[in-house]
Amino acid sequence: ALGLIPKFTLGFGVPITAQSLGVMLCGTVLGAWRGGLAALLFVALVALGLPLLAGGRGGLGVFASPTVGFLVGFPIGAFVTGFIMDQWRSAPVGLAAGVSAVLGGILVVYAFGIFGMMMTLNKSLLEATLLVQAFIPGDLIKAVLAGFITSGLAKARPASVLSRS
């Protein structure tokens, strides 16, 4: 459903979307393994051609675009986000979710995204890193949202936040 929110494509072919929030929530809510597998299923469905990405994109062609690294990083980012949530049980849920989302949902996913942009756009590490800076403010807002959403869900239905069970 987050792919249905309109995208804003930057000049180098990578769109700003709400989908990274989904990756963050996979980890904060479902935990490491379930979250990583849910994100992997999403990527597999995209590869099979389902139009789940922003703008109704799907199919193997998206894996030849500058977004390939981000897509490959989604399951790993969700896993890392969930792993941090699983390990950091002593912190308040919202704080743990926000920090986990930054570390797994931003840093890990960006590492893959930067590599993908280096390969598809023929950019240096520095050039690709500078290109992704446009995403940082929005993704930090999404990480804060992931913290609030996960905290609210934990209060309303504690058993539904599997990263804490």
Where do the language-model regions lie?
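Hydrophobic transmembrane alpha-helices
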Residues: A1-G36
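Juxtamembrane membrane-interface segments at transmembrane alpha-helix termini
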Residues: G27-V29, G49-G56, I141-A143
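Interfacial aromatic-anchored transmembrane helix boundaries in multi-pass membrane proteins
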Residues: L2-P15, V43-G77
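Structural signal for the C-terminal ends of transmembrane alpha-helices
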Residues: V29-W33, V80-W88, G152-R157
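Alpha-helical transmembrane segments in multi-pass membrane proteins
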Residues: G3, V23, G27, A38-V46, ...
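Residue-level signature of transmembrane alpha-helical entry/exit and packing/kink sites
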Residues: I16-V23, G35, P66, F70, ...
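Alpha-helical architecture
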Residues: T17, V29, F63, A111, ...
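Membrane-embedded alpha-helical hairpins and interfacial helices in multi-pass inner-membrane proteins
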Residues: F12, G56, W88-S165
